[in-house]
Amino acid sequence: MKRAFKWGSIIIVCGLIISGIAYLGHKQLFDPMSPIEESTANRDVLTRKSFNKIKVTASSADVIIKQGNHFTVSYYGNKNHAVHAQVKDGVLKITQTPVTHSKLAKFQLLNSSDEERCIVTVPQKASLTKIEGHVNNELLLNRILAKKINLESNNGDINVLNSEFDQGKIITTSGDITIRNSSLIQTKLASTSGDINLNKVSLTKGCSLLTSGDFNGQRLTIIGHYSVTNQSGDNSITKSTIDGAKLTTKSGDNNLKRKHRSGGSLERNTTEPNFIYLKNVSGDNIIK
């Protein structure tokens, strides 16, 4: 009886150790809608100089560019993966110490319960001429005006809230693109392995490209010609302002208002100036 109890205790202890390691190695999910806590604990203010262009490269930190009271760049997280910021000739350049594979394993075991975040604040009336961001994790822009953007994430999502861009591109390799309450002019959206989700967005020209994800649009306003091209996901648009549309798919269904067709194409008011074209290979097209 004592022997069984002893073995049972050992199994329980081992289970607790494994659970603890799994917890420490698991990074908390990034929620773009949650309030951003900016306590002074473990915070480094990198610069307070003004700028009109941003060029950021981050190997492991989430990057947040948002409206604030002043020009500020702050970093919260592990100092071994420190973020560096420099302003020269109006250009804010942000870089981060790369994380090697050996350091990454140790970091995940001991420190990954702590979030790594680089937060850039821009005053309300400031308009940026260009934002260039190349990150490995999450990227969030909130209440930002920019003439040109070039945003890319390898393994994280890109979220845009309450912002206006005149031209550019937003690209994810393995993550979603989510845009809400924003205006995009001549902007290309592309996702290799993720969804594109738009809600209350004005789209002036431009396009969306997907390989293996869904395009979800709600309450969109289409100005000029806009196209959505998908390889193996569904394209869905609801409650949107669209004058004309064309839907094509090789091995899926087309649903345009009350019209339905398997494969082939459906179209409506194709000569209208504000027009959207949904192209698909092996997925459905839906406009309600």
Positions of predicted regions on the chain:
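Hydrophobic membrane-insertion alpha-helices, especially the h-region
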Residues: 6-23
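Edge/loop elements at the starts and ends of beta-strands within beta-rich repeat scaffolds
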Residues: 47-49, 122-127, 144, 163, ...
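N-terminal Lys/Arg-rich, disordered targeting/topogenic segments
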Residues: 1-3
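Right-handed parallel beta-helix
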Residues: 130-181, 188
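Short, surface-exposed interaction patches in beta-rich subdomains
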Residues: 177-288
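Beta-strand-connecting loop/turn residues
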Residues: 52, 69-71, 88-92, 147, ...
